[in-house]
Amino acid sequence: MFEFNLTVPAGATHKKKIVGRGSSSGWGKTSGKGHKGQQARSGGKVYAGFEGGQMPLYRRVAKKGFSNYPFKKEFYVVNLAMLETKYSDGETVNKESLMQKGLLRKGSLYVKVLGTGDITKKLTVDVDRISASAKEKIEKAGGTIVQSEA
C-alpha cells in the first residue's frame, strides 16, 4: 500500500488556551470575563432578545397575519423529461411506479408533474396535481390523465 506523510502546515494548529493560570498568561485572574456582572458568573449567559427584564421587542409587537403551516401540502415535483427517460410506451405513472423507478423519495405524500421537457410516449398519468403545460403535452402525445385532486 501507499505510505502517506500527512503533515499539517506550520501555524495551522494552536494549543488550547488554558485560562485562569496567572496574569502573565494573558488570560489570568478574570479569565477574559471582565469584572463582576451576570456575564462573569457561572451560567451567566442571557438569551438572544433579552432586554434586561423589560418586555422584549418580540413580545411588544403584535402578532399579525395568518399561517397555514399545519395544513401545508408538500408536493414532490416530477418533470416530463424524467418520465420520458424512465418510462416506456403504455405504462402507468403513479406513486408506486415512481418509487420503483427511483424518481420519488419514500415518504413523499403528494406528487405534481410539471411540463419541463418533451414527451413522446403514450402514458397514463395518475398523480395528485399536474400543470397545464404538462397536461397539454401528455394529451398531445396520446396519453391520458387520471387525477386524484389533493
Curated annotation (Swiss-Prot):
GO terms for biological process: translation. Residues 18-43 are annotated as: Disordered. The keyword Chaperone does not apply. This is Large ribosomal subunit protein uL15. The keyword Metal-binding does not apply. The gene is rplO. Belongs to the universal ribosomal protein uL15 family. It comes from Treponema denticola (strain ATCC 35405 / DSM 14222 / CIP 103919 / JCM 8153 / KCTC 15104). One of its GO terms (cellular component) is cytosolic large ribosomal subunit. PROSITE patterns: RIBOSOMAL_L15. Part of the 50S ribosomal subunit. Binds to the 23S rRNA. Disulfide bonds: none annotated. InterPro entries: Ribosomal_uL15, Ribosomal_uL15/eL18, Ribosomal_uL15/eL18_sf, Ribosomal_uL15_bac-type, Ribosomal_uL15_CS.
